[in-house]
Structure formats: C-alpha cells, structure tokens
Amino acid sequence: MKPTAMALMCLLLAAVWIQDVDSKSMLTVSNSCCLNTLKKELPLKFIQCYRKMGSSCPDPPAVVFRLNKGRESCASTNKTWVQNHLKKVNPC
C-alpha cells in the first residue's frame, strides 16, 4: 500500500474512533437539557442522586442521574426502571 494511502486510512480510522468515543461521552447532559437518554438500565448502586429536567426541554421527559464518579447520565422518565429508581434515590 502506498504511504499516502496508508496515512489517509490511519487518519480516517482515528476520526471514526474519536467520533465513537465522543458520542458515548455525550450521552449525558448538554447544559440544562438531555440530548440523548440511556438505552439500558443503570444499576442503582452507581447512582448518587437525580434532578429533573425543566419543562422547556424537548421530549422525551428526562432526569439526570449523578453517578458515583461525578459523571451524569440522562434517562427517560417513560421507562419503568427509571420510575423505580426515582422512588429509591434522593433528589440532588
């Protein structure tokens, strides 16, 4: 393979990898509204507290869970597991 083609392929792979890493970390919070919500259930043991999103945020209605290591993740309040977790976790 030519060196320029190899370099171009490496750059392309790096760009795809960075995009994938970035999209996973952005599954959380953007200022005051959730852009995306979790697809899978978050174990209760990782959650410290929660806060509800304001009414000015677009659908779906969501909460932000503050996790043990200072991270935050959004979850849709339409999901049964989220409603159950809200009964067991204190607001922030």
From Swiss-Prot:
Keyword set, alphabetical order: Chemotaxis, Cytokine, Disulfide bond, Glycoprotein, Signal
CDD domains linked to this entry: Chemokine_CC
Recorded GO MF terms: chemokine activity; cytokine activity
Pfam families: IL8
Record's protein name: C-C motif chemokine 1
Stated role: Cytokine that is chemotactic for neutrophils.
Disulfide bond residue pairs: 33-57, 34-74, 49-92
The UniProt record lists the keyword GTP-binding: no
Signal sequence region: 1-23
UniProt key word GTP-binding: no
Cellular component GO terms, alphabetical: extracellular space
BP terms from Gene Ontology: cellular response to interleukin-17; chemotaxis; immune response
SMART domains assigned to the protein according to its UniProt record, in alphabetical order: SCY
Swiss-Prot/TrEMBL induction comment: Produced by T-cell after stimulation by antigen or induction by concanavalin a (Con-A).
Entry similarity comment: Belongs to the intercrine beta (chemokine CC) family.
Residues listed as glycosylation sites in the UniProt record: 78
Organism this protein belongs to: Mus musculus
Effect of residue 64 to I: In strain: DBA/2J and SJL/J
